[in-house]
Amino acid sequence: MDLSEPIHDFLLVFLGSGLILGGLGVVLLPNPIYSAFSLGLVLVCTSLFYILSNSYFVAAAQLLIYVGAINVLIIFAVMFMNGSEYYKDFHLWTVGNGITSMVCISLFISLITTISDTSWYGIIWTTRSNQIIEQDFLSNSQQIGIHLSTDFFLPFELISIILLVALIGAIAVARQ
């Protein structure tokens, strides 16, 4: 997307905060339905990050596959479970939660200090001068389609067969 720098920065901060809040919602909310909806927020924000980086095909695949299929499947599976069992032994804070929180906070602080101490001056951005001219006239989705139908035809078909078998198995298990 060709946006001005302040708008781009604002969208990055907005989507980043959506990712953080959605991730916290996935982990901290006691109701699994609300956690699944928070996961949907995280996946939509990730898809919008792909749109900001001009990867429209990956963004569409993210929305269709993860939000449209996986997250709906998670919500569908959670709705089949008995909801009363989630609130029986719910303790607000345990020792394991404290240890996990301390480990995550220490990893976060070490990551922030590593990023801030790194010299970013020597990084050289690569150019597209050595690519073939004809590929510039094709969009990303056309290039992916060409590769899937030529170079990666056999792995693509094998993955589709494996997913079909898994779907049939899930339906058979759900019917019993």
Curated annotation (Swiss-Prot):
GO terms assigned for molecular function: NADH dehydrogenase (ubiquinone) activity; quinone binding
Pfam families: Oxidored_q3
Subcellular location: Plastid, Chloroplast thylakoid membrane
EC numbers for this chain: 7.1.1.-
Segments traversing the membrane: 10-30, 32-52, 61-81, 92-112, 152-172
Main localization category: plastid
Enzyme's top EC category: translocase
GO cellular component terms, semicolon-separated: chloroplast thylakoid membrane
Catalytic activity: a plastoquinone + NADH + (n+1) H(+)(in) = a plastoquinol + NAD(+) + n H(+)(out); a plastoquinone + NADPH + (n+1) H(+)(in) = a plastoquinol + NADP(+) + n H(+)(out)
Keyword entries, A-Z: Chloroplast, Membrane, NAD, NADP, Plastid, Plastoquinone, Quinone, Thylakoid, Translocase, Transmembrane, Transmembrane helix, Transport
Topology within the bilayer: Multi-pass membrane protein
Translocase as UniProt keyword: yes
InterPro entries, alphabetized: NAD(P)H-Q_Oxidoreduct_6, NADH_UbQ/plastoQ_OxRdtase_su6, Nuo/plastoQ_OxRdtase_6_NuoJ
Family: Belongs to the complex I subunit 6 family.
Subunit structure of this chain's protein: NDH is composed of at least 16 different subunits, 5 of which are encoded in the nucleus.
Function noted in UniProt: NDH shuttles electrons from NAD(P)H:plastoquinone, via FMN and iron-sulfur (Fe-S) centers, to quinones in the photosynthetic chain and possibly in a chloroplast respiratory chain. The immediate electron acceptor for the enzyme in this species is believed to be plastoquinone. Couples the redox reaction to proton translocation, and thus conserves the redox energy in a proton gradient.
Entry protein name: NAD(P)H-quinone oxidoreductase subunit 6, chloroplastic
